[in-house]
Amino acid sequence: MKRLLIVQPGEKLASLMSVRGDFADWVRAGMGLGEADTRVVYPHRGEELPDAGMFRAVVVTGASAMVTDDEPWMLRGALWLAETVRAGIPILGVCFGHQWLGKALGGEVTDNPRGTEVGTVTVMLTPPAADDPLLSGLPATLPLHVSHRQSVTLLPPGAVRLGASVMEANQAFRYG
């Protein structure tokens, strides 16, 4: 079976790393995978993103960077994300990864006009979430941990909103 590709575009705080591991560790633990089941790439360190067709799916983690910084690695990565979506490879974007994916697909990312959202928030799923392969079967409201200053303020053309909170209209979306 093909491995899962984890794209980690940033580092965690050192104080959290010693207690909970890195973002890639969180993804592996949450999905019940070992290191042999995954490959981790760090584009912010200059690592090239591989041919996504070699993997069964992609998870793009969070980062402390801001998507709107438009650093060269972010711009290259956005092209890679859009190509990967066009190739039909499933991608899950989490936090920064969600915003990066939204921007790569033609959406808009800005500082959240309602301010920074941090802590455990209630995310309300939309009716289309009931038929979503990832979210179907979950309760209509979920307590989720968040920490972000920026938001996908305009969904990519053709995207479907799957979840929102009081401060964030686009907590989750599906594209394609």
List PLM regions with ranges.
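Surface-exposed, flexible loop/turn segments at secondary-structure boundaries
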Residues: 12, 46, 66, 99, ...
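Structured helix-beta-strand junction loops
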Residues: 34, 80, 87-88, 141, ...
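Cysteine-nucleophile active-site neighborhood
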Residues: 61-129
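Pocket-forming structural segment of enzyme catalytic cores
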Residues: 105-176
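N-terminal beta1-alpha1 cap of cysteine-dependent amidohydrolase-like domains
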Residues: 1-87
